[in-house]
Amino acid sequence: MTTEQPTARLQRVDSQPENPFSALIEDQSIVIIPTFTLESGVTLYNVPVAYTTRGTLSPSGDNALVICHALSGSADVADWWGPLLGGPGQAFDISRFFVVCLNSLGSPYGSASAVTYKDGNPEKGLYGPEFPLTTVRDDVRIHKMVLDDLGIKQIAAVVGGSMGGMLTLEYAYFGKDYVRAIVPIATSARHSAWCISWGEAQRQSIYSDPKYENGYYSFDEPPAAGLGAARMSALLTYRSRNSFESRFGRNVPDPSKRQNINGTERLPTPPNEHWAIHNDGHKGNWSGRNSPAPEKPAEKTEVQYMDPQFSGTKTFSKSVSTTDGNAQKRPATYFSAQSYLRYQGDKFVKRFDANCYIAITRKLDTHDVSRHRARPDSENPVREALSQIQQPALVLGIESDGLFTFEEQKEIAEGIPDSRLKRIDSPEGHDAFLLQFEQVNQYILEFFREVLPDIMSKTPTDGAAIDGVGKLTKSSTFGEAEVEDITAW
């Protein structure tokens, strides 16, 4: 439920016709900022910022709870952190808090980005690859303009994971009189060389797609192969080796869920069988000039069926000659882990834009809380910058996180004077903060009760309730939680 406040003065729009991705988010508002100068010095005009609100702002405007989304997230908190959102007993209690989530610049989900008009002018066309570099600091500054327009005088707490954790840390520098508490989760004080390198590899996947066209592609012909490959690469950094091994091992997928990337598949019949195995999963055109000509086998059957994961996608079972006695002796060449990655890649390209992916990953690269905050000769600039954060902080980390390591969470907690570090127990890796709802919910609730007693002690409008998360009823579009059994792939 999006709640408009009577104090709002800036213009709002209900839709963004040029951007097909913004329509994926229900019940969001888009506010237009007349002018905004980025950290780089570039000035944008008529800047859209998408956001959602839930709950009621207190008369004194001091019960706002700001939630910050991750790289591919949106302003729809209910989608990716839904089990934490609700009433008493849930961390994001809308009977106590006015919950606000704002979309970051560069994202395709409503805020200014590659898929919105330049300066809001249809005659200028879309930004495309000409959308300027934005930083995490740009996000929090423009978001504050929206929060001010909503009548928010003080933020009770800011919570965010991954990229959202970066925004959470930056919010703290507005000072303790404006932001009372922060909860950075599975994030970093500055983007590491490891993360920068993964972002570069993912961008190169997009650049290598012939359909990328230097960023001047159409919505009808996007670089889907490159973006899908980037997503697969990213997903491996979001999970852990042990997570994939326990879920998939060397399982062979159910044939009915085999991912058909090209619409139809060449049957692996002699003489093209080896070629087909070699190119399995390639998203290019199967009819290359050097591909072998099909040859009719002695006997074969072709079974057409509908892939249950992709409505309307036709796939065909593989067939081999019935006279081939060695078929059962051949090793498996297609595994459940591959099937799952292809499924995730295909799902992602339907909801995200390649130029936006490039823009957001470059935004992450700029993140460094010590920039312009530490002395030039400082021996530990990050520690010096973190020491300036005055709010109480709850830092949540994941031991199995190979992307934003637990050591990085310790660095944050050790640098912030009034902090406490808690561990999310999970083998799932980085994405555990979007999967382990019970643990995240309990840690945040305990922290809020400690540092926000005036808000948490109020009798909620819905009455008392036992601590606990809501039930996950559908797979997340913008997060990682899934209701289906992914081990079936």
Curated annotation (Swiss-Prot):
One Pfam family in the UniProt entry: Abhydrolase_1
Functional pathway: Amino-acid biosynthesis; L-methionine biosynthesis via de novo pathway; O-acetyl-L-homoserine from L-homoserine: step 1/1
First-level EC class: transferase
Similarity comment: Belongs to the AB hydrolase superfamily. MetX family.
Gene Ontology MF annotations: homoserine O-acetyltransferase activity
Keywords from the UniProt entry: Acyltransferase, Amino-acid biosynthesis, Methionine biosynthesis, Transferase
Documented EC number(s): 2.3.1.31
GO biological process: 'de novo' L-methionine biosynthetic process; homoserine metabolic process; methionine biosynthetic process; methionine metabolic process
Annotated AB hydrolase-1 domain residues: 63-435
Keyword Amino-acid biosynthesis assigned: yes
Matching PANTHER family: HOMOSERINE O-ACETYLTRANSFERASE
Originating organism: Emericella nidulans (strain FGSC A4 / ATCC 38163 / CBS 112.46 / NRRL 194 / M139) (Aspergillus nidulans)
Reactions catalysed according to its record: L-homoserine + acetyl-CoA = O-acetyl-L-homoserine + CoA
Region feature (Disordered): 247-272
Protein name: Homoserine O-acetyltransferase
Active site: residue positions: S162, D401, H430
